[in-house]
Structures are given as structure tokens and as C-alpha cells.
Amino acid sequence: LLDQILWMMPGAKITSVYADIRNVINEEVDDYFKILLRFDNNVTAEVELGTYVLTDKEQDKWFERHWIMSGNKGTAYVDGFDPEGKIVRTTRLLSNAGNGRTMTAAGPTRSFGPPAPGILTTEALPEVNTCHRDYFENYIKAYNGEEEFLVKISETRRVLALMDAVRESGRTGKSIAFE
């Protein structure tokens, strides 16, 4: 999941990493984690995985959350093992309700009311046609000098360094400066 987010953020540096890591069922397995990544381009990415996050909603998948990235112009998210997701953008920066208030089930609010019609636009994620086998076929060809590696050594090192920062944050409970 972390490598997917980094791949989608070419050129962006991670400024900080925060992680909450739990062992709910098995002490030897991190079966719950929530990771927050802040980038130098003002994007925040959240990755959450939990083997014990249960739902009884029929429309939800057993493993619902995959990842979500948000900035000041929109959000992209992917859910499920057979990932489905969308990009939701704003046509202009959202603002408070001004002098008015919106009534919600929790009471009145000036900030969390529904946006006016036409402000949010939704689009499909770009279609990607690949399979896991492609990676292994590339590895063999690249190892034999027939083509370049799809995953560069520098990309692998960056993900491993990020995983180390995630572990350190999970251990200390503190945000870790990165890159």
C-alpha cells in the first residue's frame, strides 16, 4: 500500500510519518495499523488496515478501506481487495456556511453542511491493465539484461526507509521527520 502511494506522488517528498500499530489478535503480527503521511505538496495520505475491523453492512466489503489521499482540491480513494475507488474534486475551495447554519443530526454547524450543488465533481480512477505476473516476468527479463527493472532499487530503498520510520513512530507514538 505504501509503495502505491509513493508511486502516485512522483517528486513529492514525505515531510512526516505518524503510525499507530497494534497487535490485536496475534503478538507476532501487526494486524492493525493506521499510517499518516504528510507530503511537501500539502497532500496527506492515510493508510489503514485492520484484520479485526468488522462490519455488518451488506454493501461493504469485508476489507473495506485500502487508502485515501486528500489535498485542498480533492480526494482520491481506493477500497477493497478488488480495488474500487474514485477521485472527488471541488470546482472551488469549500468554505463555511457564512451567516447561515446547516442543521445536522448532531445539531447546527457552519462548517460541515453539504456543499452547494455543482461544487463537487466525481471521476473514475485511471484504468490500469496489468496483473501480478507482469512484475515477475519483468524481474526475470531485467535480471537477464533484456529490459530495465520496473521497480527501481532506489524506489525499494525509499519504501524500506519509510517502513522503518513507520515502525519507529509506532514504537514511540510520535511523528517522525522524513526526507
Regions of interest found by a model, annotated:
Residues 2-86, 90-92, 106, 136-145:
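Contiguous beta-strand/loop segments that form the cofactor/metal-binding neighborhood of enzyme cores
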Residues 33, 119-121, 147:
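Short amphipathic alpha-helical segments
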Residues 33-34, 97, 167-168:
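Short alpha-helix boundary/capping motifs
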Residues 40, 88, 92-94, 124-128, ...:
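C-terminal helix-rich "cap/oligomerization" subdomain common to oxidoreductases
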Residues 84-132:
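A short, hydrophobic/aromatic-rich structural module that often spans a beta strand
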